[in-house]
């Protein structure tokens, strides 16, 4: 269920301050964050944000198509290694 339009987008204040500081300074270093719940806003376009996935920070380069999505959508938390192969099928 999407967030109500009258409430506006959610973004953690500490992340917003880091984004504003990077835009003002023209800094291209990745911004480290644990805030997967924050929404991507237009001020973030062109920045690289390192989003924590529970184990490491995954660098995410923000483009204009990402606006309105959450940062956590671009940093997968689970790795799928495939199902175990059936040993009986291999012998035949």
Swiss-Prot record:
Sorted UniProt keywords = Ribonucleoprotein, Ribosomal protein, RNA-binding, rRNA-binding
Q: Name one GO biological process term.
A: translation
An example of a GO molecular function for this protein is: structural constituent of ribosome
Q: Which domain of life is it from?
A: Bacteria
Q: An example Gene Ontology cellular component term from the record? A: cytoplasm
Keyword Ribosomal protein present in the record's keywords: the answer is yes
Q: Name one Pfam family in it.
A: Ribosomal_S19
Asked if the Swiss-Prot or TrEMBL record annotates the protein with the keyword Ribonucleoprotein, the reply is yes
Give the family per the record.
Answer: Belongs to the universal ribosomal protein uS19 family.
Briefly, what is this protein's role?
Protein S19 forms a complex with S13 that binds strongly to the 16S ribosomal RNA.
What protein am I looking at? Small ribosomal subunit protein uS19
Annotated source species:
Shewanella amazonensis (strain ATCC BAA-1098 / SB2B)
């Amino acid at each position: 269920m999407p967030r109500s339009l009258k409430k506006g987008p959610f973004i953690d204040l500490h992340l917003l301050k880091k984004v504003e500081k990077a835009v003002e300074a023209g800094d291209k270093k990745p911004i480290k964050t644990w805030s997967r719940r924050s929404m991507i806003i237009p001020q973030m376009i062109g920045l690289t944000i390192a989003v924590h996935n529970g184990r490491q920070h995954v660098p995410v380069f923000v483009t204009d198509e990402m606006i309105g999505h959450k940062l956590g959508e671009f940093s997968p938390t689970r790795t799928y290694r495939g199902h175990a192969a059936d040993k009986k099928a291999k012998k035949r």
